[in-house]
UniProtKB/Swiss-Prot annotation:
Disulfide bonds: none
Enzyme Commission numbers on file: 2.1.1.-
Function: Catalyzes the transfer of a methyl group to L-homocysteine resulting in methionine formation. Can use methylcobalamin and methylcobinamide as methyl donors, but methylcobalamin is not considered to be the physiological substrate.
Pfam name, any one: Meth_synt_2
Protein name: Methionine synthase
Primary gene name: metE
Length: 308
């Protein structure tokens, strides 16, 4: 079974330490987030994860994109849409993905181990933002589709940068406030034309949305099961075998490190429903809020449980 992560990892940016870094800082070229990316890559590699992330160290999942996309801005920590949504001049995440890939290739030449490209989904971007201009805040469909057009370009940038797969994060889809038909059209628009696997991450209770999600044109549905064991019942009831399942099997809301046996038993329950060959083993969600030691230990036990 392939092991992966959902995205964020608890490493911190740091200031310049070496002479070379201080010189870069003097000339305005030092990137304080690169040490955090390198630390995230090394931790995930040491834990044995197959498809890693760059750690998503530059900020929260909405703000990082909103700060770069035309027609959006951040005020007092809130994402605001003030004009028509347009693409940035370049990629938002390709440089970090390439850097993470370079670090990984320095650790191993095993091409089965790669870096996933991650984008925050169009519905989550729009519903997490305050609309102050151009779009109707009571009818967000147009904004969602314009955002999908921007994110389709970003997904292609990430693919061209060497991403092993593309993950679209859509936590808002389980909340009940999103128009699922529009959400599906937006996701399908992003996925169309990509040559690598596309995974859709939706955390939360999937009881009212799984039937819709199964119709989306993605290769993998990434869902949480450790923190929401009731999702297993929903999966068993509604599953049809035309997609992979990203199987969240460690709880990212608690510092408690699950034992290998506990994780293994949960994975077995998932395999009994969808088949071991359809499982991608990962945490429930991002790990940003966990202590680094707990995050690493959870990943290590997860990988060992998946391999035994």
């Amino acid at each position: 079974m392939i092991t992966t992560v959902v995205g964020s990892y608890p490493t911190e940016p740091r200031g310049p330490e070496t002479l070379g870094e201080r010189l870069l800082n003097f000339f305005g070229s030092y990137d304080r987030y690169r040490p955090a990316i390198e630390a995230a890559v090394r931790d995930q590699f040491r834990a044995g994860v197959d498809i890693i992330s760059d750690g998503q160290v530059r900020g929260d999942m909405v703000g990082h994109f909103a700060a770069a996309i035309g027609g959006m801005k951040i005020e007092d920590g809130t994402s605001i849409i003030y004009s028509r949504i347009t693409p940035p001049a370049g990629s938002i995440g390709a440089a970090d993905l390439r850097y993470a890939y370079r670090i990984l290739r320095g650790l191993t030449d095993d091409e089965s181990r790669g870096v996933k490209g991650i984008i925050t989904g169009p519905s989550t971007m729009i519903y997490a933002s305050r609309i102050e201009g151009f779009y109707d805040p009571q009818k967000r469909d147009r904004a969602v589709m314009d955002m999908a057009g921007v994110l389709k370009i970003e997904a292609k940038h990430l693919q061209d940068a060497g991403a092993a797969m593309i993950q679209i994060d859509e936590p808002f889809l389980s909340t009940g406030i999103v128009d699922m038909k529009t959400a599906g059209r937006a996701i399908d628009h992003i996925a169309a034309g990509l040559d690598i696997e596309v995974s859709l991450h939706v955390c939360g209770d999937i009881r009212n949305v799984l039937s819709d999600l199964l119709r989306f044109k993605v290769d993998v549905l990434d869902l949480e099961f450790a923190g929401r064991p009731s999702n297993l019942e929903v999966l068993e009831e509604k599953w049809r075998g035309d997609k992979g399942v990203g199987f969240g099997c460690v709880d990212t809301t608690t510092e408690r490190v699950e034992s290998m046996e506990e994780i293994r038993n949960l994975i077995k329950r998932g395999a009994d429903i969808v088949g071991e060959e359809n499982l991608y083993i990962d945490p429930d969600c991002g790990m940003r809020k966990l202590p680094r030691k707990a995050a690493f230990s959870k990943l290590r036990n997860m990988v060992m449980a998946a391999g035994n």
